[in-house]
Every structure is written in structure tokens, then in C-alpha cells.
Amino acid sequence: MKFKEFDKPEYFVNRELSWIKFDDRVLSEARDKNLPLFERLKFLSITSSNLDEFYMVRVASLKDQVHAGYKKTDIAGMTAKEQLKAISRQTHDLVHVQYSTLNRSLVPALEKAGLHVIFEHEAFSEKQKEFVDQYFEDNVYPVLTPMAMDSSRPFPLIRNKTLNIGALLSKKDTKKGKEEIDFATVQVPSVLPRVVIIPSEKKGHTTVTLLEQIIERNIDKLFLSYDVICAHPYRIMRNADLPIDEDEAEDLLVEIQKQLKKRQWGEVIRLEVEDRKSTRLNSSHITITYAVFC
């Protein structure tokens, strides 16, 4: 074999796809039943935070290349657009395995260890409903800032990596005699613990739920003059790549500080919504993506 043949694309693996394989290897630690349960949960959370950073930096960089019309292939023979398609396929597979690991392996193991997790507020018992409703009134409601979008109120930008709840609201327009549908959102407050201990129905068990489920159950209290059609959690990733030219920057530290501030408001790279979302809400998200998130 001639030495020059070693530069053939088939001899190389794309850097971004190789990174996804790395994150999958981290995920394999979460599936290892020989490890302590909370260590497995920690590895699962690491794969998720890794994926966030991957999208905000590496995927964002590829999108910038596509927008700039850059069509040169990488060492593995893939253009930026081809890489994005392959990344989408493989990350969907990775996320599927993440949730499969959580729901089929870790959650049952937690249950066996005496920790019951309620992921959907519809599953609350009457006693639990009473508790979370009071918890909402006392602790959550005072720190919420609901925001609705209509013709008179421009929608604010959603902060990077924040967890939010999107809702479709219905209000009958009596003048026009038709129903008006508005989109509203509320950020899940980071000042409160996301995991909330609630009364347990099983003796000797600890039961917990997620803060967003408490808000979702009580979201109608935020929009008293509307009917809430549906409400579901969502999260966005923004472009956090730092395009700094060290040679051109007069003050590198100042330039880095400027770019870090911009990271919260960069172009939207990824939108995450829960699997059981309403198709009507999903269609509304698609329609208003650029108006709301960009």
C-alpha cells in the first residue's frame, strides 16, 4: 500500500460522530448494573450535559458553516450539511437510549431501593394533589413570571438552557365572535429545588416529583382570564461558540467577556420538548419558532 493512500476519507472517522460515540461510552456506565445506583444516575446526567455543550458549540459551528455556504469536506469526506444530518440521526438514537436507561433500568432500581418518582402530575393521589397545590401557592407562585405572546406584546427571548413550560391559551373574542389562541410561557425557577419531596402512598418509601409538574398542574392559576388548552415543558439550546480572533482582538479578556454575555442570546440550535406533548402545541411551536426564539 502506498503511503499517499492513507489520506483516503474511508480511513477516518468524522470528529463529531466520534464524539457521539464517546458520549455513548459514558452512557454505557449508566447501564452498568455493577456500579452503585447513584453513580449510574450521575453518569446519565453527565451524558446529558455533554450533549448540551456539544450542540451549543460543535453543532452551532457546523450550522455557521452551512449558513456561510462553506462546502469543503472534512478529513472523513463529509460536508457540514452531511455532518448535521448524521449527527441528528445518531443523537436521536442516543437520547432514546438515555430515556430507555432511565425508565427501564434506573427508575425501577430506585423504586426497589425505596424511592418512588412521579414524572406526570396526572398520577398524583388526592393527598399529593393537596400537598403540591399548597406548595405551589406558598413557594412557587411568588417567583413565577408568566409571559404571553399576542399582537400587543412582543415575545421576549428565552434564555439558553433554561427549563420552561409552554402553554396554549384560549380566549373567546366576543367582538369578532371567534376563539383566539395565544402562546404563553413561564420559566421554571432555578431558585427552587427541581426535585420536590411529596407525601408517599407507600409505607417506608420516599416519593418525589419534579417542579415543572407542580407548575404544569397549577398553570391555570397564572392565566385566570384564559382557558389552558395544554401545557408542556420545553428547553432550548443556543449557539455558544466563541468566534474570537486572538490576533485581531485589541483586548482578549474584554472580547471574551463580550462573547460570554452573547452566549445567552445566540441563535437557537436545538429545541427539546417532552414526548407526550400536544400535537397542537407542537404545531404552534413550529409556526412561531423564528418569531419567538430567534
What residue spans do the PLM features occupy?
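Single conserved hydrophobic/aromatic residue that forms the stacking wall/gate
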Residues: L281-C294
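N-terminal non-catalytic structural scaffold regions of very large proteins
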Residues: K2-R280, S284
